[in-house]
Every structure is written in C-alpha cells, then in structure tokens.
Amino acid sequence: MAEDRYKLIVAKDYTEQYFRDMWNAAYCKQEIYTFDGIRVFFYDDNFDHAFYESTDRRQGIHKSKKKDVLSMRRLSRFYWIKDVLRDPDAELYVGYESKSKSYTRSKRVAVVKNNYVVVIQIYADKKAKFITAYVADNSIDKIKEGPKWVDTKKNAD
C-alpha cells in the first residue's frame, strides 16, 4: 500500500545496536527486489555507510570521507530504503564514479520525495549491491543534472 511507504521513525527512541540488529534482520537476511526485478544484496558493513555521516561535511568541508557520527536523520528513514527500491515512481539516474570522474551504468541512483536518494551497484544481470542512502541536500542538483536511467534491455525489445 502506498500509504504504508515513507514513514519516519523516531530514531532517538532506539539504540545503535537495535538498529544494527534490525539492519541485519530487515535487510541483510531478506530477499529484496527493486520494482523492476533487480535483487539487491545488503551486508552488515553497509550499515555504517548508510547511517553515519561526517561532522566535517556538516561544517561545509566537502573533501572529508570520514563518517564519524551516527545520523538520527538517516536512521529516521531506516525503512525508506526498501520503499525507494520498490517505488516505480522514483526518479532514476545513472550513477557517478568519483574515481574515474564519469557516469557509469553499473550504479543506479533512485530519488524520491524530499530528495532522499538510494544508490545501488549493479554487478550482474538482475543483481545489485546496496551502496548508500541519504537525504541529498547538497548533491541533489548534481544528481539531477546527470543522465536519466534508461532500461536498455526493455528498450531493446
């Protein structure tokens, strides 16, 4: 049901360990598919990337890669990751590879309301790995300037 999607939770009411356990139960141990049939795999080590953020970035230092603070904002959207992946109305974009400074179809970025973003890495036919999820306050314009995702297999028919 659409009304059951995109509900916020009060993250401060739970411990980090609770969320880590829930991550394992709700994501790592489940078979999760995108709306278009891609199986997305989740791993324990994805938790930190998805739910920690950098204090340097909060202070406007955008070069920092360290993630040193658990984000209540990200945790409040804990279940949104599944919602985004399953949402056929999400805006889809080709992902950006910072190392090569180019767009790559091995990454897919899904954007939904309030600029919430989920990134997956496609590594085989109908298989992907979860990369991260966040509210794209500072990067949403850059994401939306990139190429739209087009399902090349669907268009090849």
Predicted regions, residues:
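Ribonuclease/tRNase effector modules and their secretory precursors
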Residues: M1-D157
